[in-house]
A protein has these predicted regions:
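Acidic, low-complexity/disordered tracts enriched in E/D and polar residues
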Residues: 1-36, 40, 86
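Long, charge-rich, low-complexity alpha-helical segments
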Residues: 27-86
């Protein structure tokens, strides 16, 4: 499945991650380096499988762990109303 960021999301990139602000809810969220990479790929309209494949190439991680981490972060971004299905 593909997701897209909501238009009302502001992003500030930090040295070790990013901070996201949902202008609708007025809440902010912090992401670590992996979460930030996932956010970047969502903005490029990558699907969940592509995101997992990219993490497997870029990080030393086993596939089950990468899949679980991607799903967890996507679920958190959905719950925070920062992304929606594309």
């Amino acid at each position: 499945m593909r997701y897209k960021a909501i238009a009302e999301a502001l992003v500030a990139t930090l040295s070790d991650g990013a901070v996201l602000l949902n202008l609708q809810t007025k809440r902010y969220y912090s992401l670590n380096e992996t979460g930030t990479r996932i956010w970047e790929m969502v903005q490029q309209t990558a699907d969940e499988g592509d995101i997992v494949a990219t993490l497997l190439r870029e990080y030393e991680v086993e596939e089950p762990m990468a899949r679980a981490e991607v799903r967890r972060i996507l679920d958190e971004l959905i719950d925070a109303q920062l992304i929606v299905p594309a």
